[in-house]
Amino acid sequence: VPVTGPGLVRKSPTYLADPNFPLFMRWSYVPKLLPWLIKYLSFANESDTRRISQGLTTIVGDSLEQHKALTAQTKAAKWVQSSNYSFAYADRAAFNADAFGWQLRKEAGFIPDLIEGRAVQEEEPILGFGTQLLAVLKGHGFILNPGSYVQDLVCVLKELGGKFIQAEVKDFDLSGGKITAVDTNIGRMHCDKAIVSSGIWSKPLMQKLGLHVPLEAERGYHIVFEQPSQKPNNPMMLAAGKFVATAMDQGLRCAGIVEFGGLSEKKSKAPLQLLRRKVQEVFPKLSFASEQEWLAYRPAPTDSLPYIGELSASGVFTAFGHHHIGLTGGPKTGRLVADMIVGHHPNTDIRPFDPMRFKRGK
């Protein structure tokens, strides 16, 4: 379900004025952000939200199976964990207020089991009594340690004969509209196919190819509570704080918050302070040895749909702009792009992800 739901335009001023709502803006960045923001908010209506949700479902609807298939019989498989996924609400009224989001999830085939009252704490003892309803989705999963997972995937690539080269891309060489080489800080790499898959940093690479994509950095804040006294049994979204709590290899990771402020490396204090307050509210008995803060840059297209496809038969393919779901949708995206590269027509409708869609006025 995308962030741009019905009512966002009307509610945004209230959200920004509320220090307890997990939406922040670096006001000095607003003039640069404004063209993107206007387009972004134009999709905050029922029909577009439903269309976007349907598109995203094709990328993440079977993500657990996709990750398991990708890692089968490899050292990376140990990081893929099966689990339930819960949405935690203060009460039935708070759950009902999210009715449109649940309607979209049900249309996508995700039907929750509802747990209420004291049974909530029996299901998840870490939760305080301020949480009186859990909406539980079964058959989901998570990655126990994303960093180690990706490192192991690189090892698998090498074992299969692939090469991993880290370099800074300077430009692309095209002849007759076809890719012939990628220019980097360590030399020119000749190729007849290339994939742009660099998150928010894909935007300047696309500009080198003559395409200006509406993409902004949505800054997300994470805190890992190391050696926690309690952990949730399954990953859960805390509706009141708009953050996800997951028991991971490093500790209890609480991730969420939205801040628009570009690619500044400086962390803002207010989002982290709010996240700590919300964690304390919902997990009142939690204690921990130490904590680690993390700031990430989510690549956010104006229409919340990733850019997946080929740029005008150039041999250059795109796979970026996954917003909050990059790791989740990675395997399916990779399979789609791999099929396109070898000339197989994907059995998934990829038109919603066309990287040329905004150039054509969509």
Outline where the language-model segments fall.
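Hydrophobic/aromatic residues within well-ordered alpha-helical segments
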Residues: 56-63, 198, 271, 275, ...
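Alpha-helix/helix-capping structural signal
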Residues: 93, 200-201, 332
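A conserved short coil-to-beta-strand element within the FAD-binding core of flavoproteins
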Residues: 114-124, 142, 163-180
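Surface-exposed helix-capping loop/turn segments at secondary-structure junctions
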Residues: 69-81, 159-163, 211, 283-289, ...
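Rossmann-like flavin
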Residues: 34-155
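C-terminal catalytic lobe of FAD-dependent flavoproteins
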Residues: 112, 239-240, 280-362
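Active-site substrate-recognition segment that forms the wall
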Residues: 1-43, 171-179, 187-315
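Active-site catalytic microenvironments for nucleophilic, acid-base chemistry
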Residues: 73, 156, 208, 336, ...
